[in-house]
């Protein structure tokens, strides 16, 4: 056999092997929502709002009951999911400072290993991609480290729009869902090559409050009567609040900067919560449109569907809305898988987090990871393998937060029945410890001084995972450098710009004192 003929034979054999391999690998669809409380995906939380397509995933797949974000804010959490690494390793400190644009994600690896890939909608994992708003992201540091308080967010409000026929409230998300649906139908025409599709939704993140100007954050919970009807009003609870004097100092700071330190009527609180649940129902319908497209194109049987979120939403729990907190409403995320070869109707108690998605998807696609990962593959929990060569998942998860609306870097270690919160250098801010979340589900009882042996054990474990005093110091240094770099770009306009940053009501009372506080910090 001539060399040319042999080369052709080997080429066609390799191509045939590739085609055969592709036919055995499943398609992958991930839907990642923004600010979806994971407790709504299982009882008793699931009773408050009808989520038929999440229920469908529950019945046909695997639901993780204890899934957590690795950082309760948009960009850092997504950086963890896309990179498979903890945010302190990638220095993804806030919504401005995240991953480099050329970082290798799990989807990049799928593409280089034969998958047809597509990303649609909200991505938010690279530096500068979320926002360049000077007060909310890039130089948010000064709002948390100088010794005066600022109001950064608008007061949370509920807004009803449209009527019973108004289905598409969040139009941009629906447009992205329509694009993803069209892309799926196109893939059905060439099923030989496996695909991986990612759809990022903005729902159920609250909308911008337009009256606060173009740089406003999201404090409006908007929905229509159509979606509000999906909410069981009798199950919408009014959360208990600690007295202000009993609040942890970091929690009080968050309450103040989120504009929640004033009084709220019971109606205001229940409206915010009910409208938020209705927004979750709208997001569920977008998931449903993609599931329906998979079913209609006969792709569903060979597609792994993943549903998750970057973080949760407090929805007035702990006298707060938004995220940026380690309380369950903010840190607990949904994580559901369904697809060929995976178990059906199973609930898993194992503690997991967003960094675990990276190695899990690569395992499902039979692709090897590149470089060290913080996450662990969950495939053995999804497919009930009797033999599994991967690393066993530890009995802990780590989450950390370094952004705005909190005046200290915060570290959460969930381990067994405990949730341990450490702050800053571990000395200057008192820790918190919550026991048995099934009994203290509202997380109102800090028992750190009651269980000192547990506190000592968990702090030692946390320090073995991350040198959190050193990380806090690195964030502190970054904050100063970021602020100086920003202020230098303003030149003579610095004083005017800084005095007019969004929602600031305190600056004009004593601008000189405020500027001296910043100079002292620097």
Residues of each region from the PLM?
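C-terminal cap/loop subdomain of S1 sulfatases and analogous C-terminal strand-loop tails that border
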Residues: 311-317, 355-358, 363-437, 465, ...
């Amino acid at each position: 056999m001539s060399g040319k003929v042999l080369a052709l034979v080997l080429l066609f054999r390799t191509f045939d092997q590739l085609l055969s391999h592709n036919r055995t690998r499943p398609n992958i669809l991930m839907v990642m929502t923004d600010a979806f409380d994971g407790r709504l995906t299982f009882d008793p939380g699931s009773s408050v709002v009808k989520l038929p397509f999440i229920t469908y995933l529950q019945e046909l797949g695997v639901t993780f009951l204890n899934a957590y974000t690795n950082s309760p804010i948009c960009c850092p959490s997504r950086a963890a999911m896309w990179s498979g690494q903890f945010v302190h390793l990638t220095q993804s400190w806030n919504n401005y400072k995240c991953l480099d644009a050329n970082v290798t994600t799990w989807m990049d690896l799928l593409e280089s290993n034969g998958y047809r890939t597509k990303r649609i909608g909200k991505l938010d994992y690279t530096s500068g991609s979320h926002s360049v708003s000077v007060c909310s992201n890039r130089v948010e540091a000064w709002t948390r480290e100088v010794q005066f308080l600022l109001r950064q967010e608008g007061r949370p409000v509920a807004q009803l729009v449209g009527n019973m026929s108004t289905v598409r409230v969040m139009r941009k998300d629906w447009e992205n869902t329509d694009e993803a649906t069209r892309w799926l139908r196109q893939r059905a025409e060439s099923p030989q090559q496996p695909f991986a599709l990612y759809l990022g939704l903005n729902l159920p993140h609250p909308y911008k409050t337009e009256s606060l100007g173009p740089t406003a954050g999201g404090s409006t919970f908007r929905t229509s009567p159509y979606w509000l009807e999906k909410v069981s009003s009798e199950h919408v609870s009014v959360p208990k609040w600690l007295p202000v004097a009993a609040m942890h100092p970091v929690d009080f700071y968050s309450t103040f900067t989120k504009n929640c330190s004033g009084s709220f009527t019971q109606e205001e609180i229940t409206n915010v919560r009910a409208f938020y649940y209705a927004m979750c129902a709208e997001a569920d319908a977008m998931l449903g449109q993609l599931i329906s497209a998979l079913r209609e194109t006969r792709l569903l049987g060979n597609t792994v569907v993943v549903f998750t979120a970057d973080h949760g939403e407090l929805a007035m729990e702990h006298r707060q809305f938004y995220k940026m907190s380690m309380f369950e409403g903010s840190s607990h995320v949904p994580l559901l898988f369904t697809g060929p070869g995976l178990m059906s109707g199973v609930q898993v108690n194992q503690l997991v987090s967003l960094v675990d998605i990276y190695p899990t998807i690569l395992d499902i696609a039979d692709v090897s990871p590149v470089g060290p990962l913080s996450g662990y593959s969950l495939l053995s929990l999804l497919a009930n393998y009797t033999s599994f060569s991967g690393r066993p998942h530890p009995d802990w998860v780590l989450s950390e937060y370094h952004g705005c609306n909190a005046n200290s870097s915060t570290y959460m270690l969930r381990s067994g029945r405990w949730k341990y919160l450490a702050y800053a250098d571990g000395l200057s801010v008192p820790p918190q410890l919550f026991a048995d979340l099934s009994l203290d589900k509202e997380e109102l009882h800090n028992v750190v001084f009651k269980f000192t042996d547990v506190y000592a054990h968990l702090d030692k474990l946390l320090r073995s995972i991350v040198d959190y005093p050193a990380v806090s110091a690195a964030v502190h240094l970054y904050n100063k450098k970021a602020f100086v770099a920003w202020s230098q770009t303003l030149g003579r306009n610095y004083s005017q710009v800084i005095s007019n940053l969004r929602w600031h009501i305190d600056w004009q009372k004593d601008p000189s004192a405020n500027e001296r506080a910043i100079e002292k910090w620097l």
